[in-house]
């Protein structure tokens, strides 16, 4: 900063190897240096020579290529291709863990759990539930029929969309029940809307703004997965504080490792989820996700997705928490390491703590 080289400042990487042997350096100094590097990387400066939007777009394409290759590998495995024995064992352990955590998928529970969240929806103005219930719902073509059934199950929702004039009530229906909507009352879209939000000076974060009915159903599945994770010992509602405390203790006693992955949700591929999850759960997750990115600056405005879901999808956080938990548990089982969920193992999205 002294010489005005802001590019080098925001691109600087903290490397613990620079402090080895660690006992020659003050822990306070290491902490201060790490905090300084982290803070400066996130300052929202406009710096000549850096294009955070282009960096984010390149990152999306990079992770899509990773997912494409992963999908090809799982397709080859399904067709009888070679899979390393150790990897095969871990993957099947993960299947069993995920199946036990999830149990049965109950459609009635899914319908009850569906809701709108606080974020934006594609093709809908406003972010409140009132805005979303009163707007013409957006939905992907794959989910249109199920989304229509969700709306038509709620007379008040139909009335909010169509109004309550005398012509909106059907003589064939119970008194006061509005005419059901048809597909023509929905906004059919091809996928989610590509959007960027500030993250660091060097790159933005990509967000996929979901169609209204898709995210309404996605949040229901997310709530169901969250409830089942809690029954299995992982309470995502209390995890942030628990993870911070375990990370602090690990830094003092050196008995826990902390793992924070780059682009974690963007590297969960379609075929991975299909391989790991029970069929009914996979079908439910798959039908309400988006398969394309609209308004993507490259690839002709419409990007077919190799990833299964991303930030913006209503169940991505719970989905990745379950997958990463299964990786930790399966790997520990294979290595003969004993895990204690409340003392040495925690997962919160892509923030992982393990022995």
Stretch-by-stretch model annotation:
Residues 1-195:
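Non-catalytic, polymerase-adjacent accessory regions of viral genome-replication enzymes
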Residues 1-17, 159-355:
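Core nucleotidyl-transferase/polymerase catalytic module
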């Amino acid at each position: 900063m002294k010489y005005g080289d802001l590019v080098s400042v925001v691109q600087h990487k903290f490397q613990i190897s620079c402090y080895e042997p660690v006992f020659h350096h003050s822990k306070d100094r290491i902490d201060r240096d790490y905090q300084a590097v982290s803070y400066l990387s996130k300052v929202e400066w406009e710096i000549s020579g850096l294009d955070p939007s282009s960096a984010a777009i390149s990152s999306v394409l990079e992770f899509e290529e990773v997912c494409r290759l992963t999908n090809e590998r799982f397709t080859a495995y399904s067709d009888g291709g070679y899979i390393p024995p150790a990897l095969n064992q871990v993957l099947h352990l993960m299947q069993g863990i995920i199946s036990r955590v999830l149990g049965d998928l109950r459609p009635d529970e899914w319908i009850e759990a569906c809701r709108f969240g606080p974020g934006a929806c594609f093709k809908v103005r406003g972010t409140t539930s009132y805005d979303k219930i009163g707007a013409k719902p957006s939905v992907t073509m794959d989910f249109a029929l199920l989304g229509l059934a969700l709306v038509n199950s709620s007379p008040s929702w139909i009335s909010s969309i169509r109004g309550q004039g005398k012509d909106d009530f059907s003589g064939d229906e119970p008194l006061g029940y509005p005419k059901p909507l048809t597909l023509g009352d929905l906004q059919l879209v091809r996928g989610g809307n590509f959007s960027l939000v500030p993250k660091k000076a060097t790159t933005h974060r990509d967000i996929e703004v979901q169609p209204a009915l898709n995210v309404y159903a996605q949040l229901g599945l997310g709530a169901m997965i969250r409830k089942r994770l809690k029954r299995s010992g992982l309470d995502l509602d209390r995890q942030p504080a628990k993870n911070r405390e375990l990370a602090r203790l690990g830094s003092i006693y050196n008995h826990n490792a902390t793992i924070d992955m780059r682009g974690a949700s963007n590297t969960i591929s379609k075929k991975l989820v299909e391989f790991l999850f029970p069929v009914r759960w996979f079908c439910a997750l798959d039908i309400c996700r988006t398969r394309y990115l609209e308004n993507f600056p490259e690839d002709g405005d419409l990007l077919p997705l190799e990833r299964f879901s991303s930030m913006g999808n209503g169940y991505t956080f719970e989905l990745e928490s379950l997958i990463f938990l299964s990786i930790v548990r399966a790997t520990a089982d294979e290595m003969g390491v004993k895990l204690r969920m409340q003392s040495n193992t925690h997962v919160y999205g892509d923030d992982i703590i393990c022995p």
